[in-house]
From Swiss-Prot:
Contributes to the activation of female-specific DSX splicing in vivo by recognizing the RBP1 target sequences within the purine-rich polypyrimidine tract of the female-specific 3' splice site. One of its GO terms (cellular component) is nuclear speck. InterPro entries: Nucleotide-bd_a/b_plait_sf, RBD_domain_sf, RRM_dom, SRSF. One of its GO terms (molecular function) is mRNA binding. This is RNA-binding protein 1. The lineage of its organism: Eukaryota, Metazoa, Ecdysozoa, Arthropoda, Hexapoda. GO terms for biological process: mRNA cis splicing, via spliceosome; regulation of alternative mRNA splicing, via spliceosome; regulation of gene expression; regulation of mRNA 3'-end processing; regulation of transcriptional start site selection at RNA polymerase II promoter; RNA splicing. It holds the Pfam family RRM_1. Its main location: nucleus. Extensively phosphorylated on serine residues in the RS domain. The tandem heptapeptide repeats in the C-terminal domain (CTD) can be highly phosphorylated. The phosphorylation activates Pol II. Phosphorylation occurs at residues 'Ser-2', 'Ser-5' and 'Ser-7' of the heptapeptide repeat and is mediated by P-TEFb. Dephosphorylated by the INTAC complex when transcripts are unfavorably configured for transcriptional elongation, leading to premature transcription termination: dephosphorylation is mediated by the mts/PP2A component of the INTAC complex.
Length: 144
């Protein structure tokens, strides 16, 4: 079986927020309903996520739409098309970078311009946290 990083990214699905006792068998059972599987890999250290590779890209997309937010292995799971270095980003494909949960598309270095890259950075000054019995968000000033 190939290492999970060598799987076909067009057919690879990221499964997040899995319980620590999630088994390969349970995940196979949930995902095989959408099409034939090539590989299933469940993280053990740290636990909480898995990758599932389908034979066909369309089955992976169907499973992603159907299973995202459903309960599996005792928790409500997050299911997304996986992303990685070998995915063709020129077509605008992307996704989460794994456990970050951002769900944002990533911009490749070649697609960035100096103005785009520098406009994404801000100076944050005067961070203040007020004491309270209830957690309060930090207040800050942005200087553009």
């Amino acid at each position: 079986m190939p290492r999970y990083r060598e799987w076909d990214l067009a057919c690879k699905v990221y499964v997040g927020n899995l319980g620590s006792s999630a088994s390969k068998h349970e995940i196979e059972g949930a995902f095989a309903k959408y099409g034939p599987l090539r590989n299933v890999w469940v993280a053990r250290n740290p636990p909480g996520f898995a990758f599932v590779e389908f034979e066909d890209r369309r089955d992976a997309e169907d499973a992603t739409r159907a299973l995202d937010g459903t309960r599996c292995c005792g928790t409500r799971i997050r299911v997304e098309m996986s992303s990685g270095r070998s995915r063709d980003r020129r077509r605008g494909e992307g996704g989460s970078s794994g456990r970050s949960g951002s769900g944002r598309y990533r911009i490749t270095p070649s697609a960035r311009t100096t103005s785009t890259a520098t406009s994404s950075f801000y100076n944050i000054n005067n961070l203040q946290q007020q004491p309270s019995s209830q957690p309060q968000p930090a207040t800050f000033n942005l200087q553009l």
